[in-house]
């Protein structure tokens, strides 16, 4: 959540939708945050269920179908905005998680979150990250993300926001063609803040070149 009540109103000066990502360590944390955001000028809520569930020994909400469904139901009861459930790739079968949040009443899903990785400092002979493990993002995870978006698109009937290693229009189009209704750019923005604009322009160029009148023609065209 934003650290100040001034942050969200500040963003309203821009002609775009505002999506707030919500994290928590317990169901109560999520519910409390969502209730507070109900009074803010926010368009959509993205619920990050990759967070560890303290009451369940630290297992992420998004790794247990019953927990994912329960947190979705709890959030939907109090949410005043549409709810997007952000799915973790660190599971045996991501379609089971997608089905769980769909059953819980989610309005959409976003995927994938970061993969869990580890880095060792060989000179100091210790972990390079204080938490021992950390999220891996960027181009390396893109093929995995495309595969999971494809799987989820064929398993549920909710809109999908595809993400994971998108740097170019081609990367974004891959996501769209396997079923994503929208895409998100994360890590690439740290290298080039104009990445998102370049991706949008690139998609438009592709559509013009290939005589695609409506991007909906591309959503899920690869099955």
Regions found by a protein language model. Give the residues of each.
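Structural signal for hydrophobic packing residues in well-ordered secondary-structure cores
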Residues: 15, 38-41, 76-79, 203-207, ...
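C-terminal helical cap(s) of enzyme catalytic domains, especially alpha/beta-barrels
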Residues: 120-134, 176, 188-213
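A short, charged, Gly/Pro-tolerant segment at domain boundaries
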Residues: 216-223
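Short, small-residue-biased leader/transition segments that mark boundaries at the very start
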Residues: 1-3
């Amino acid at each position: 959540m934003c650290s100040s009540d001034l942050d969200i109103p500040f963003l309203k000066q821009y002609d775009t939708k505002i999506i707030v990502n919500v994290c928590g360590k317990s169901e109560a944390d999520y519910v409390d945050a969502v209730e507070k955001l109900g009074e803010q000028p926010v368009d959509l809520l993205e619920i990050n269920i990759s967070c560890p569930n303290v009451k369940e020994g630290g297992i992420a909400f998004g790794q247990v179908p019953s927990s994912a469904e329960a947190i979705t139901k709890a959030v939907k009861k109090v949410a005043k905005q549409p709810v997007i459930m952000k799915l973790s790739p660190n599971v045996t079968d991501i379609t089971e998680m997608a089905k769980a949040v769909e059953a819980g009443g989610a309005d959409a899903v976003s995927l994938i979150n970061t993969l869990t990785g580890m880095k060792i400092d060989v000179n100091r002979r210790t972990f390079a990250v204080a938490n021992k493990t950390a999220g891996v993002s960027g181009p390396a995870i893109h093929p995995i993300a495309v595969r999971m978006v494809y799987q989820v698109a064929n398993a549920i009937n909710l809109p999908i926001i595809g993400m994971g290693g998108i740097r170019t229009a081609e990367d974004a189009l891959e996501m769209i063609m396997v079923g994503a209704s929208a895409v998100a750019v994360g890590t690439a923005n740290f290298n080039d803040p104009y990445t998102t604009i370049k991706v949008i322009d690139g998609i438009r160029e592709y559509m013009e070149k290939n005589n695609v009148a409506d991007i909906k023609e591309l959503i899920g065209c690869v099955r």
